[in-house]
């Protein structure tokens, strides 16, 4: 996947989710940051570009491990339930973005509180164009879908 993104001739951003990383004691995060470094995509203090990879996880510990390896990698904390205790005081692992299921849109006002703190909002998996307005109303900064062409066409009709 990294090779395809590198070789496609234009910038492609990758959202990499670490699945159940806690079982491996940091090996997943180590391997991922090593791969990012090998491709030259591990952000450094001297490089203003955070790179094309953002890391997503349901594990705050995994995000903290990534943060320790490279403080500038964009991080997304994924949640499955509204108002998780972990997000009341901010996002774990120094994540700048909250990632939620499309089913959580409109669940309560907790998304507004997250946005008021300046955090981004990623919504997954949005395959129904009828949910786009909900995503935009919630302040989504990214929409994750299995139907990118269809979603892009719909977004184009909204922006003219």
State where each predicted segment sits.
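Short loop-to-alpha-helix "cap/lid" segments that border enzyme active sites
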Residues: 1-160
